[in-house]
């Protein structure tokens, strides 16, 4: 494994795979804030050159957070299909990029490949792609998921109806709900961000949504975006729930800051499949976004694209219905301007598609 290259008459040497990944990233204000960004465009190009020549096995053996220290890393590594990985482990990241973009390789081929990839590999290949590359590659991958409705079919577009209210007033919520459905929104989800995160308030809104959906026979699923433990308790007390929501991070420390671990998410999924209102099998709804780990000092010195890819690696374990990347939501300290926001959105869409494309062979 060679971590140095000569460029413009200067030798650039990097200390670790983690540093190569970080400095090969397109410029992001969040990486600058974290102190992991390339110091110049020349160093960024040098890091990309080094990254392009790394083997996939180098990335497999050098996760940005050690296996022994992090639950998310363990989930990502343990879920790799080793038969597929053995066939591609000697590819370079550059060869992986060329393979994905080759017109001979389409949806089923890429879905087979994805089973052998870790999140670090997914992030690495994204860093070598132009915006157009990301669009073309993501567009090859077809992911369909089903709760009560099926989303992701080619040529279709689904939306979330979000009838938030400043005081969680039921009449105000339902007025927004009816207006939104009148516009044809909400086939992906009827989902409210609550002001009151209590079990009683969550139950009340879930019942209200479910009654409305059943009365008018609306083909959708509903959710109150309270904390996952609140939603579990609401379900245990009989509240009708379509999807279970939780914001997730790309490290165990980040998830701890959000107040959960993988066992809690598994409990939520099991409960929703047992007593929820969705036919399934996909009943989970996750939210991510580049930079969230830095907010809780849970990035472990890694860049925000790599940590975002790890979010999808964690999510994959639970076969979610929706994964929503809130690009730019946190603020300009992580994605400063529209150029960075657009790039992040394209990266996230590609990495999410490549990671979450599940097939059964």
Enumerate the language-model features and the residues they cover.
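Long, compositionally biased, glycine/small-hydrophobic-enriched stretches that function as flexible linkers
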Residues: 1-142
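Alpha/beta enzyme core
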Residues: 36, 46, 171-187, 232-355
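A cross-domain feature marking catalytic cores of carbohydrate-active enzymes
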Residues: 161-163, 192, 222-226, 247-248, ...
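Conserved small/polar residues in nucleotide/adenosyl-binding loops
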Residues: 359-361
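N-terminal small/glycine-rich loop or linker at the start of catalytic domains
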Residues: 69-72, 141-165, 283-296, 328-330
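Active-site-adjacent beta->alpha loops and helix N-cap segments on the catalytic face
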Residues: 138-147, 196-209, 255-268
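A glycine-rich helix N-cap at a beta->alpha junction
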Residues: 211-224
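Glycine-rich, proline-tolerant flexible connector loops at the mouths of alpha/beta enzymes
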Residues: 189-206, 327-336
